[in-house]
């Protein structure tokens, strides 16, 4: 029986938030994390996002995202994902090789989430790439201009959709 070993990861996340007639896409750094291997199989992992690294071309928006209206970075400087299960996929139409299920914590609110990743090897690097969809940001206490919290008619073009899309790209040495 192969023993599990844990390897450190680094990487980044591209995020996209949308509102009426607009979309904003920026980045966020993965500052800590690990992938757990058993032989050649990925069996677990976790990663921490430094919310202070939220970046976008508009400094005013970045400041607002870091404020209590959104991520309240001064109080909640990190967000974290911890894997609960990893399932190998065969022949997935999207090209994904694994289904990952786990717990995502943002603003000290933890909820289960599942997403597909493509795990690939190149040289001495193991890389995981995938898209994560947070369907309801209000579950994490991010309620600013949400249609679930505020009157849509009053929000008008100030409405911000509740879905947040994240594109994960992390890697580790084999």
What residue spans do the PLM features occupy?
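Low-complexity, acidic/polar, glycine-enriched regions of mature
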Residues: 1-174
